[in-house]
Amino acid sequence: MSAVEQHIPNDQFLQKLTAFYRDSKIRGPKSVYVTMKPYDGRTKAMPKGSTFKEGDEISCIFRAKWGSKKIATEVKAKEVNKFHTQYSAIIVAQMVNLEKRKKTDDEKKKTGATKA
């Protein structure tokens, strides 16, 4: 992406996120990273100690990264419930992709020692 991040529409974000999860199961990196944070439209950092003003409409920005591919969307306060419902459905559907982490020999020794 360029220096100024381009946000895609929410529906398109969810479609691409689903594709990221599907592709991570088939090929490429196994991990898909999703982050979210409050967003007020600024492109530069806020000074220390400053907070959102009462008049500001606070929205939420969702970012997803899979390998070198990145996507982002801005969810307005009015659309949060609808978006969260759709996002939750995607996450629940992708839980089948979870794999049990393989423990190293050191971790096996530590857990065995604590059980005794």
Swiss-Prot record:
Single GO MF annotation: endoplasmic reticulum signal peptide binding
Coiled coil: none
Protein's GO biological process: protein targeting to ER; SRP-dependent cotranslational protein targeting to membrane
Keywords on record: Cytoplasm, Ribonucleoprotein, RNA-binding, Signal recognition particle
Pfam family, one: SRP14
An example Gene Ontology CC term for this record: signal recognition particle, endoplasmic reticulum targeting
RNA-binding recorded as keyword: yes
Disulphide connectivity of cysteines: none
Subcellular location: Cytoplasm
InterPro entries attached to this UniProt entry: Signal_recog_particle_SRP14, Signal_recog_particle_SRP9/14
Similarity field: Belongs to the SRP14 family.
Its job: Component of the signal recognition particle (SRP) complex, a ribonucleoprotein complex that mediates the cotranslational targeting of secretory and membrane proteins to the endoplasmic reticulum (ER). F37F2.2/srpa-19 together with F25G6.8/srpa-14 and the Alu portion of the SRP RNA, constitutes the elongation arrest domain of SRP. The complex of F37F2.2/srpa-19 and F25G6.8/srpa-14 is required for SRP RNA binding.
Subunit structure: Heterodimer with ZK512.4/SRP9; binds RNA as heterodimer. Component of a signal recognition particle (SRP) complex that consists of a 7SL RNA molecule of 300 nucleotides and six protein subunits: srpa-72, srpa-68, SRP54, F37F2.2/SRP19, F25G6.8/SRP14 and ZK512.4/SRP9.
Protein name listed in UniProt: Signal recognition particle 14 kDa protein
Organism, as annotated: Caenorhabditis elegans
Lineage: Eukaryota, Metazoa, Ecdysozoa, Nematoda, Chromadorea
